[in-house]
Regions:
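Small beta-barrel nucleic-acid-binding modules, primarily SNase/OB-fold domains
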Residues: 2-11, 19-168
Length: 168
């Protein structure tokens, strides 16, 4: 049975497109900005990457921290302390110079121009999921970037159920 190249070519094109949609790329960590944002070297440029699906407390006074304080009823000092704790936790998982893999989802950038992605540590674990599982982040689901929503929900329930991190 011989398959002609003409018949095989469309299949190969579709396959390569499908594989590239969620391809991982290796990047270097430059620094941890806060609990859900990193600076990375991406394609030769310094870029910010916002971790998809998670939201850690703010670690600096800004309008978002004020809204968070109003929404939760926590004072600003508590919000900032929780944000710093989340950032410190992320710093235990990634350091400047570390090589990690990133996977972008459907929407590649947010309105601030930051990359939106899932970050994989050298041990293969997803950083986004590890932060949630350890209790240092809430869930933040923004369609269409929902590829790993179920994993993150399970991690969140596990953290809350076991009083981990900020849920102590």
């Amino acid at each position: 049975m011989q398959i002609s190249l003409k018949r095989l070519l469309p299949f190969l094109i579709i396959l390569s497109f499908a594989l590239s949609l969620h391809a991982q790329e290796t990047v270097k960590i430059l620094r941890v900005v806060d609990g859900d944002t990193l600076k990375i070297n991406y394609k030769g440029k310094q870029e910010s990457i916002r971790l998809i699906g998670i939201d850690t407390p703010e670690s600096r006074v800004n309008p978002r921290a004020k809204r968070e304080s109003q929404r939760t009823g926590e004072d600003m000092k508590t919000i900032l302390a929780m944000g710093k704790e989340a950032t410190q936790f992320v710093n235990t998982l990634v350091k400047s110079g570390d090589k990690v893999s990133i996977e972008l989802d459907i929407e590649k950038r947010d309105r601030n121009g930051r990359l939106l992605g899932y970050v994989y540590l050298s041990n293969g674990k997803m950083l986004n999921e590890e932060i949630v599982k350890s209790g240092y982040a809430n869930l933040l689901t923004i369609p269409p970037n929902i590829k790993y929503q179920d994993r993150l929900v399970r991690a969140y329930r596990e953290a809350r159920g076991n009083n981990r991190g900020l849920w102590k």
